[in-house]
Design a protein with these regions (language model features):
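Catalytic phosphate/metal-binding cores of nucleic-acid and nucleotide-processing enzymes, i.e., regions
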Residues: 1-110
């Protein structure tokens, strides 16, 4: 069986997130000069990370979070988040990482 390229899984995840949140998937995963991130909402820039096969763990790099925050600011977005999954199609659960400050705003309804 031929293994699909990483891009296949990333694009699938990005499309799912965009559909679920009512946003738009960025072409080429935001690799252009002015369009960054993977999924864009009105006030949010989303970075998406997935595994190509089921896993029990996921390494989160600080660089991913910091870069997404910087790109969100540069694009005039008020919020940034990293959404990831463990690559398991039988348990397709997505998880969201935001700062504690963002979380406080959400629970206070700000």
């Amino acid at each position: 069986m031929t293994k699909r390229p990483t891009r296949y899984y990333s694009k699938k995840q990005e499309n799912l997130i965009a559909k679920e949140l009512g946003g738009n998937r960025q072409p080429n995963s935001g690799a252009t000069m002015f369009s960054k991130g993977d999924v864009v909402l009105d006030d949010w820039l989303i970075e998406a990370k997935t595994k190509t096969s089921p896993s029990n763990s996921m390494t989160i790099h600080r660089e991913w979070l910091e870069k997404n925050e910087e790109e969100a600011f540069a694009m005039g977005k008020q919020h940034s988040a990293l959404i990831f999954d463990f690559g398991d199609i039988h348990y397709p659960q997505e998880y969201v990482i935001i700062t504690l400050e963002e979380f406080k705003k959400l629970i206070k309804g700000e």
